[in-house]
From Swiss-Prot:
Pfam families reported for this sequence: Mqo (PF06039)
Disulfide-bond pairs as recorded: none
Protein name, UniProt field: Probable malate:quinone oxidoreductase
Organism per entry: Bacillus mycoides (strain KBAB4) (Bacillus weihenstephanensis)
Cofactor: FAD
EC number: 1.1.5.4
Keyword tags: FAD, Flavoprotein, Oxidoreductase, Tricarboxylic acid cycle
Any GO MF annotation of the entry: L-malate dehydrogenase (quinone) activity
């Protein structure tokens, strides 16, 4: 019946990696809780979590240069890199816990060992990379990293990239074999298959139209069943909005004070994919370069081996694009619809501040296939246009908010949890490092929204995620033990990953 209210304990909006992770944690911590999932699309993991809609990097700051900045005194700040790496370790540990208990199977279908490399050109950049390597090498989380600036070593490490390179410009690379390629789409589908066995109600082709607080304090969620055309009303004590780019409009509908003065700026991504399997087989790594001066952090170019549908692929990008949609399957009215009286000044301030980003996006949108090939040839000098196609990746909505440090309308490059003061509702906003840190971010949701249960849950959390609440940097022996044990469980035999 359309007007009948259906009660439950927890509602998860969006069937992506975040809801899948939160649902899996809750089913282990509070198995008696009833959970319902509502997803607008026909299957799980079809938007940002889909394997073609993200880079599939197990982000652990092994190769991403934007996580290590050079300070004014010339030293390297590795704080952000350590933080991202520690967060990825939590994900590894939780996935290993699930595999060990046969709750999900065949880890090779969602995670593969793959060297992570950084590559730079030019004297200044080589100097930066050497300093970065020296700074990271002192930390246990980055053990095993190698540095090379000798052409012979670079040719061995990067045959495809070094072939046909005539420039005498200095080049250098770092390599670490403990990197990973993660198929977040496959992982998301596995987690929802597991949740189904735990009697979690999965509702596909169900679009959430509104979220409002009922008089009894529960959250009332209005859902459009796209299969039958009927409207349903569901109530829950706790709601999580994990709808990727679609989270901001839903958060705004809640009316909670924490949702005010927040805006979103959508950026679309394009990748070039190689269709010549002979070329694909000549590369075996994720190789990250350095963003061009003035380009935003999400524009770091990288040439990636990927494992999609158990087949090796080669992708280069990202190229940014602009679309007013908040989701790949969204509406052209998403951006304008998100402008409210409480955030219009924040949005306008960002517009003025981010003229450089706007100019960059316009330039990116105007690029022809041949212009994109020119950028690719900076990585692969011999690349041929006919070997490469362009694929459209997912939409990312960067958060805009007022901050003490940046002032009004500051663009945030990161992932952020916004929750009500009483912890009854939470939403995940933002982009990178995103899926890689899903376990860390969902544990943050539990801490913010269930503070009264955390002490009781802590032993179980530590069983699932042994380094929860512990700094692995300060406990190198624990890191080595956990890295080795999770590697065994997940089938990440690093030596097999080294390119011959």
């Amino acid at each position: 019946m359309s007007n009948m209210q259906q009660k439950t304990d927890v509602i998860l909006i969006g069937a992506g990696i975040m809801s899948a992770t939160l649902g899996s944690l809750l089913k282990e911590l509070a198995p008696e809780w009833e959970i319902k999932v509502f997803e607008k699309l026909a299957n799980a993991g079809e938007e940002s979590s889909n394997e073609w809609n993200n880079a599939g990097t197990g982000h652990s700051a092994l190769c991403e240069l934007n996580y290590t900045s050079e300070k004014s005194d010339g030293s390297i700040d590795i704080g952000k890199a350590v933080k991202v790496n520690e967060q990825f370790q939590l994900s590894r540990q939780f996935w290993a816990y699930l595999v060990k208990r046969n709750l999900i199977r065949n880890p090779q279908d969602f995670i593969m060992p793959l060297p992570h490399m950084s590559l730079v050109q030019g004297e200044k950049n080589v100097e930066f990379l050497k300093k970065r390597f020296e700074a990271l090498s002192k930390n246990a989380l980055f053990q095993g990293m190698e540095f090379a600036d000798a052409p012979d070593t670079l040719k061995k490490w990067l045959p495809l990239i070094m072939e046909g390179r005539n420039s005498n410009e200095p080049m250098a690379a770092t390599k670490i074999d403990s990197g990973t390629d993660v198929n977040f789409g496959a992982l998301t589908r596995m987690l929802f298959d597991y949740l189904k066995t735990k009697n979690v109600e999965l509702n596909y082709k169900h679009s959430v139209e509104n979220i409002k607080r009922a008089k009894n304090g529960l959250w009332e969620v209005k859902v459009h069943d796209m299969n039958s055309g009927k409207i349903e009303h569901h109530t829950a004590k706790f709601v999580f909005i994990g709808g990727g780019g679609g989270s901001l409009p839903l958060l705004q509908k809640t009316g909670i004070p924490e949702s005010k003065h927040i805006g979103g700026f959508p950026v679309s991504g394009l990748f070039m994919v190689c269709k010549n399997q002979k070329i694909v087989e000549q590369h075996h790594a994720k190789v990250y370069g350095k963003a061009k001066v003035g380009a935003p952090p999400m524009s770091v170019p990288h040439l990636d081996t990927r494992y999609i549908d158990n087949k090796k692929a080669l992708l280069f990008g990202p190229f940014a694009g602009f679309s007013p949609k908040f989701l790949k399957t969204g509406s052209n009215l998403d951006l304008i619809g998100s402008v409210k009286p409480n955030n219009v000044l924040t949005m306008l301030a960002a517009g003025v501040k981010e003229m450089g980003l706007t100019k960059y996006l316009i330039q990116q949108v105007m690029l022809s296939h041949e212009k994109r090939m020119e950028e690719l040839r900076e990585f692969i000098p011999n690349a041929k246009s006919e070997d490469w196609d362009t694929v459209v990746a997912g939409q990312r909505v960067q958060v805009i908010k007022d901050t003490d440090a940046g002032g009004k309308g500051t663009l945030q490059f990161g992932t952020e949890v916004v929750s009500a003061n009483d912890g009854s509702i939470a939403a995940l906003l933002g982009a990178s490092p995103g899926a890689s840190t899903a376990v860390h971010v969902m544990l943050e949701v539990l801490e913010k929204c269930f503070p009264e249960r955390i002490l009781e849950w802590e032993p179980k959390i530590k069983e699932m995620v042994p380094s929860y609440g512990v700094s692995l940097t300060e406990n190198p022996r624990l890191f080595q033990e956990l890295h080795a044990s999770t590697g065994r469980t997940l089938g990440l035999n690093e030596k097999e990953a080294v390119h011959n």
